[in-house]
From Swiss-Prot:
It catalyses: 7-carboxy-7-deazaguanine + NH4(+) + ATP = 7-cyano-7-deazaguanine + ADP + phosphate + H2O + H(+). It comes from Helicobacter pylori (strain Shi470). Transmembrane segments: none annotated. Belongs to the QueC family. Pathway: Purine metabolism; 7-cyano-7-deazaguanine biosynthesis. Binds 1 zinc ion per subunit. Its EC number is 6.3.4.20. This is 7-cyano-7-deazaguanine synthase.
Length: 226
């Protein structure tokens, strides 16, 4: 395994784009991997491709559209569920949650890391300022890292440098990395796939949970500068 290689789960959003720039400054080679799981906001894949080109990093998409056939989420293209309600399978979770999505992403990324000889994979997950998804928490990440390494006789590290950063701190991190303008104008967060309306914090409908979280973070980021 090469310490200089890192594989990243890359959606083209604020978190994973900031993460990609962070990794590019620390590793000799960085590979970006996106996942097409029949999400409503599939425009994020187009944004991811453009950002990967701007960062001059290799990027490939793994198709996972079968997920729509085996579980529920308001994020799926064919779902008529309105955002902001409880999940059909678990009332304690938001209906934007895709059951086991991160477990699947991480497992595939772990396999990909073995293929390219990477000893690190990186995720843009955070438990400090998140949408209520249990698979974004540190205890889950540590558990799946342990399980996957046991099951493959490897010692691949899962890096989560954003784990304890809120959205305001992520905007500050992007600024410190010199990519704040890129994050605002090129990344995509909106669950509705809105790319026509540019707000101070970026493109989006301004109403969905993802937009609200990003807006709140940007306003706090701006407030901290005063």
């Amino acid at each position: 395994m090469e310490q200089e290689i890192c594989a990243i789960s890359f959606s083209g959003g604020q978190d994973s784009t900031t993460l990609a720039v962070w990794a590019k400054k620390r590793f000799k080679k960085v590979y970006l991997v996106g996942f097409d799981y029949a999400q409503k906001h599939s425009v994020e894949l187009e944004c991811a491709q453009k950002i990967a080109s701007l960062l001059q990093l290799p990027y490939e998409i793994i198709p996972l559209d079968f997920l729509e056939n085996i579980t529920h989420s308001a994020l799926f293209k064919n779902s008529n569920d309105l955002m902001g309600h409880s999940h059909a399978q678990n009332k304690d979770l938001p209906n934007s949650f895709v059951p086991n999505r991160n477990a699947i992403f991480i497992t595939l990324l772990h396999s990909y890391a073995q293929k390219i000889g990477a000893s690190n994979i990186a995720l843009g997950v955070s438990q400090a300022d998140f949408s209520g998804y249990p698979d974004c928490k540190e205890d889950f990440i540590k558990s799946i890292e342990h399980a996957l390494n046991l099951g493959s006789n490897t010692a691949i590290k899962i890096l989560t440098p954003l784990m304890f950063l809120n959205k305001a701190q992520e905007f500050q991190m992007a600024k410190d990395l010199g990519v704040l303008d890129l994050v605002i104008k090129e990344t995509h967060t909106c669950y509705q796939g809105e790319r026509k309306i540019l707000h101070a914090y970026g493109y989006g409908c301004g109403e969905c949970p993802a937009c609200q979280l990003r807006k709140k973070g940007y306003e706090e980021f701006e407030s901290n500068k005063k």
